[in-house]
């Protein structure tokens, strides 16, 4: 995210960053220069993404994609709406699959094109995790999550205007 933002800024573009901060990936001012934070008008909203066993298993009944849905936050959604009401954007880049629950909000409040920057195909990672475990129940559950993620990932490509895949392999898989 930082290198892309810096490149866009150096090319004379106006950049606004609104970011999710989690327990695993907390936002810390010290990791960014004051200049970068000022130029990007950086905002960070904490979202609780810790695995909740009850929510994880209830997603089996509701068929929600738990891996993705735990990144949705009404606080972040409200902050996003506020930004979209105040400013117009040409492009809104979603920095991972886990930001896609906000596509509906973006579409309702902006005419901007939405680009998904895909770091990897998440379902492949979960498939590998499933294959690596010897616990049969866990393997079944992880395979279920991998299947759900695959359906979600390939469904979401129809909801965005473009995909910026990090690797050629992922770009080819998305194109298939």
Task: Report the location of each language-model feature.
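A short, active-site helix/loop in glycosyltransferases that binds the activated sugar's phosphate group
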Residues: 101-102, 150-176
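Acceptor-binding helix/loop patch of EC 2.4 sugar-transfer enzymes
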Residues: 55-66, 114-151
